[in-house]
From Swiss-Prot:
Importin beta subunit that functions in nuclear protein import through association with the importin alpha subunit, which binds to the clasical nuclear localization signal (cNLS) in cargo substrates. Docking of the importin/substrate complex to the nuclear pore complex (NPC) is mediated by importin beta through binding to nucleoporin FxFG repeats and the complex is subsequently translocated through the pore by an energy requiring, Ran-dependent mechanism. At the nucleoplasmic side of the NPC, GTP-Ran binds to importin beta and the three components separate, leading to release of the cargo. This is Importin subunit beta-1. It comes from Schizosaccharomyces pombe (strain 972 / ATCC 24843) (Fission yeast). The keyword Repressor does not apply. InterPro entries: ARM-like, ARM-type_fold, Armadillo, HEAT_type_2, Importin-beta_N, Importin_beta. GO terms for biological process: mRNA transport; protein import into nucleus. Residues 21-101 form the Importin N-terminal domain. Its main location: cytoplasm. The lineage of its organism: Eukaryota, Fungi, Dikarya, Ascomycota, Taphrinomycotina. GO terms for cellular component: cytoplasm; mitotic spindle midzone; nuclear envelope; nuclear periphery; nuclear pore; nucleus.
Amino acid sequence: MNAGEFLAQTLSPDANVRLNAEKQLENAARTDFAQYMVLLAQELANDNSMPYIRMAAGLALKNAITAREEARKLEYQQLWQSLPVEIKQQVKSLALQTLGSSEHQAGQSAAQLVAAIAAYELATNQWPDLMVTLVANVGEGQPSALKQHSLQTIGYICESVSPEVLSAQSNAILTAVVAGARKEEPDAAVRLAALGALYDSLEFVRENFNNEYERNYIMQVVCEATQSPEASIQTAAFGCLVKIMHLYYDTMPFYMEKALFALTTQGMYNTNEQVALQAVEFWSTVCEEEIEVNLEIQEAQDLNEVPARQNHGFARAAAADILPVLLKLLCNQDEDADEDDWNISMAAATCLQLFAQVVGDLIVNPVLAFVEQNIQNPDWHQREAAVMAFGSVLEGPNVAMLTPLVNQALPVLINMMVDPVIFVKDTTAWALGQISSFVADAINPEIHLSPMVSALLQGLTDNPRIVANCCWAFMNLVCHFAPVDNHQTSVMTPFYEAIIGSLLHVTDQKGNENNSRTSGYETLGTLITFSSDSVLPMIANVLSIILTRLETSIQMQSQILDVEDRANHDELQSNLCNVLTSIIRRFGPDIRTSSDQIMNLLLQTMQTAPKQSVVHEDVLLAIGAMMNSLEEQFEVYVPSFVPFLSSALSNEQEYQLCSVAVGLVGDLARALNAKILPYCDDFMTRLVQDLQSSVLDRNVKPAILSCFSDIALAIGAAFQTYLEAVMVLLQQASSVQAPPGANFSMIDYVDALRLGIVEAYVGITQAVRTDNRLDLIQPYVHSMFTLLNMITADPECSESLTRAALGLLGDLAESFPKGELKSYFAADWVAALLNSGKTKISSQQTKDLARWATEQVKRQARA
């Protein structure tokens, strides 16, 4: 096989040539994977090959051993591991050799390949000398290309390999990357690569960072890099400071005082926007960290504990100097930029919002002075900045302080909705949304509501970006002024007809520019959810229009030509289904008059939509709403619906769809009760398969356990058929624990898993008790108490899990009132569990449940 020739052809503009070359390479990989890998590695290392061919070889090699999808990634890993040791060694040796290439594309491709292999082999100690080699490559006197590409490799490895695996190498890695980042390094490309590697390594060098001497040296090198004449190095250095502030806020007071305040303020004024963006991001990160610290302090105080962390007040101390800079940067709008392009004025606005949340009332006066000075300015940049500044400080300061200011500003802002400049109108619509979100009590319905609604209605006929913000403002208004318990009317009722009419026009567009159509549908759904009884005839009319649109969209499936059309069509159908869901929930049982037509169209939508379409989830959610509204009357649709539900349950690849399907099985059980029994064998088989699947996302599994509870409650003692298998699964799941030092994701998963187990136990216990078959669960009582003991001993246990555990404890006590389980209830941890539900910070629901469970347990003692 001539690898170079085929690789060149994969880049051909001729589709036939390109496809043939790709096919030849695929065949070569299937026929002799070892030879295929060696040939590609040789091509990557070949200095006589064209750069683009070498890059293609590196990419093909990387794609042969790694993938985004976990299942395929595992398959490729096994394929790589199956290669003879000498073949793997040859590929790795050629990749390391290529790191020294003066051709950057080849060196970078080699760096990515080495990191991809390292992701497998470092964890199993199959490449023990890799990091030693890379660190040596960065040493004094080595060629610049070798340094640069080795540093990039270190960065890629730090991104993809677990910190636990690399922690033993942290000293060597840090020495290498910091040495490369020093101002004494003459090659800017090497210095930039070193800063990139430092950025990627910061998470696992905590031990080094806690050492004051090492920390001082790292901070010195990074701070010096912010003063480089190269903008790219400055940007990378400020990026490192952003991450350092995020990871090591608690160690920053000395550096803030000595250097960081001055450096970042100077950086915000930099004429290179990328540098300025990172400097602003630094202060956004300061604010985010102080918001987080404040939450932790409040939580500790609620528990009568000493806070573990201190708010150093960086934002408050710097506000007087930083706020004027941010306000000035607000005026640097780029009218030619796309809305999705992140620029300095957007970054400044975001930073201003975060400052408002941290410093509160302190921000109001300086911002108000800026607003008053610029709100009427002939220069639209100043006007828009004034509106942006006002809208940015509405979350954080005391509402009582803001209310008179909002009262004064509203008439001005409403008038600015007809400003001749689109950017001003867009920001004004956003500011009205901010007011209706955070200071809605300042809106006087008798004075402000009518002109505000009129201005927003006018905005719905404007540019799509303005439409989206007007929709958001309407959603906030409708939520705030919602009728209490769907009473006959609300202050928003007189405007419903006009708003709904405008939204139906907005949503009747072929395109979805600036997300305007989707925003329109979301707003329509919100209006329906919070509608008063008096507008239900209007909602019925909306239902008719939505069903017509859904039917038309089904007929259009055959006319879709390309990926863009498919995405647009899927989004439209999802929006229609979401509005239908709102209508079904709002009408409740009264939806029965239209349910035949709705169900027919929803099932057609599922049948005609592509297998991978996101529409399936939204259809299922709409059908779930129908189940909850109709309850037992939904039975007529079950035979035609169950095949779709079963298919979704078995779709392990699309875990979100599977998760929705699991929830619907529970809904169906609650709706049908014992009438679900004929379908239980199929459902239980699929649910158990999902639990045992290695492909399905683990976060779906707690919901499956909860679903067992719903099925048990629906069919009572008939659950005996599945009891033994389910109890074995629950016992296995109970053994899952978060290891010491586990991340929050794992801790949350274990908590959710235990919640699902407890809910399953509760449902099964209540089901067999109702049918007087408590004998069925007696063999499993010991497992239940073992789990409850584990939950009680877990310091990370959430309140929802504590509440569920109290419920199970009380149910067991109530179910065996004659003292059959007396010895279990006498354990010391039982009292600890009961007391954990009565703490100061427990919700009233948890306290009530704890009191009830305590009464049940006391009866055990008296039995």
